[in-house]
Amino acid sequence: MALTCTDIPKFICAVLLPPIGVFLEKGCDYHLAICILLTILGYIPGIIYACYVILAY
């Protein structure tokens, strides 16, 4: 999917605090719960998953 202007702030949020970027993209969904869990288990997996969600949707 093509990147839009709104994806840039989402990526910035995804790097600083990954669940925020996912919340801005998908809202309160199971993706948010997965991202929170991955961020707690390891910061880098949370960032990777957040970037995946932003790029995929």
Curated annotation (Swiss-Prot):
Family: Belongs to the UPF0057 (PMP3) family.
PANTHER family attached to this UniProt entry: HYDROPHOBIC PROTEIN RCI2 LOW TEMPERATURE AND SALT RESPONSIVE PROTEIN LTI6 -RELATED, UPF0057 MEMBRANE PROTEIN T23F2.3-RELATED
A Pfam match: Pmp3
Localisation: Membrane
Transmembrane segments: 4-24, 36-56
Keyword Transmembrane: yes
Keyword Transmembrane listed: yes
Membrane topology of this protein: Multi-pass membrane protein
The protein's name: UPF0057 membrane protein T23F2.3
Domain of life from the UniProt record: Eukaryota
Signal peptide positions on this chain: none
Keywords linked to the UniProt accession: Membrane, Transmembrane, Transmembrane helix
Coiled coil: none
GO cellular-component term (any): membrane
Family matches, as InterPro entries: PMP3
